[in-house]
Amino acid sequence: MSVAQPPRPRSIAPALLLLALAAPALGASAPPASATPAATNAPFTDAQLEEARLLRERSLVDDTGYETLRSLTREVGPRSAGSPGDARAVAWALARLRALGLKNVHAEPVTVPHWIRGPCSVELTSPWPQPLAAVALGGSVATPEAGLEAEVVPVTNLDELARIDSSRIAGQIVFYTGRMQRAEDGSGYGRAVTVRGRGAAEAAKRGAIGVVIRSIGTDRNRLPHTGGMRTEPGDRQIPALAISNPDADLLEDQLASGQPVRLKMINSSSWADSARSANVIGEIPGRERPREVVVLGAHLDSWDLGQGAHDDGAGVAIMSAAAKLIGEARLKPRRTVRVVLFANEEFGLSGARTYARDHAAEAASHVMGMESDLGAYAPLGLHARVPADRLPAIRAMQSVLASIGVQYRGDDASGDADVGQLEALGVPVCDLDTDASEYFDWHHTANDTFDKVDPEMVRRNVACYAVLAWLAADYLPGFGRAPNGH
């Protein structure tokens, strides 16, 4: 997940419903095409809903998603844009989608930025010297080889920075103290992440020589969180590092003493030339309208500190497994289900923007888009952005997922960061909320590793996307164009 589009605040869902339906037999013959509608003017027939329920139950006992994630984290690991790990991830994804039975598997080239992390450090030099656990923010420039040392000016957020006279900032190191709040819907991220995105640029405008931020995360361990910064033409670039939450507490405690506090920061990160990566695509061809597609999206890149297990290895695995199970269903959907594993979400959405540009002429044939990029946690709610007369179909799709705990939450889907580039072209989208209470403990840290992922949560997510994609691809009228699409 990038700084480009943090999750929007959404309402808190009721407690997760218990799984209640026993799995029906999977070996029955395919339903006849003339099956009776479930109700007068119902969006789906009894046969379609039964197929979706069978797919749900099969997904809930299938570990393709979990084993796909194991393979990605074991055989590739970290895969930041432009790195050797990125190239390995593209090769891995091509092989994996083929092994899962997807068709038309191919790579579409994407040019990506290439930032290389180097060693860094932050040290309290007075009044009480101590080392602090730190990482460079993505895109940070280097310090001089000997580092930078200056007095610390604490500010809570960008609003407070704007109220401070520049004379207090000039020549100093700005420390952003704001703490991210834990929330089921992840809304604390959106409120906190602006200082990571624009904190260095705004401090530089006021003469700061460096920036340190409290990690954008909800944990209390000493592994700091990285993440991308957002620069604009004309911005003066200064070094920017994140320190862990306990180290930020220590720094605040020293500041509370009333004595001047000084920091020394060293960073040796650098930029290299742009690199070649790729969006990796595979399909389950539709039985009647193969040129019309439902997109299942996730981003293949990750940050370089951990394995990228939750962000977004889980999404890659979930969407790949959902497509594989759709391909094994008794009845293939009318339209094609297309998995798109996007390049470089973390450093500016290069893959999603390239896909939207290269496929703009086919936007009308994109029937629906969905994205998984909030880890593998309990699915809680469904949002959509479709014409009002198509909402009954969305609610019928949600009803198949009620036994997993998914409620319908609103008509305000965005497609999230990557698939949102398609929503801007008028492609209808669905968003699946998951419980984000723990996600930001690991997000963008060395702790984002395979052991943090619960196989049961992977299965539930696979079930949700398999059902949603199958029904969306088989829905005869289609979903038209997204309201307010361009």
Task: Say what each PLM segment does.
Residues 49-51, 126-135, 139-166, 229-309, ...:
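Soluble metallo-hydrolase cores and metallopeptidase-like ectodomains found primarily
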Residues 129-130, 145, 238-243, 248-249, ...:
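Metal-dependent peptidase/peptidase-like ectodomains
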Residues 41-44, 48, 54, 70, ...:
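Noncatalytic luminal/extracellular "stalk/propeptide" segments of secretory-pathway proteins
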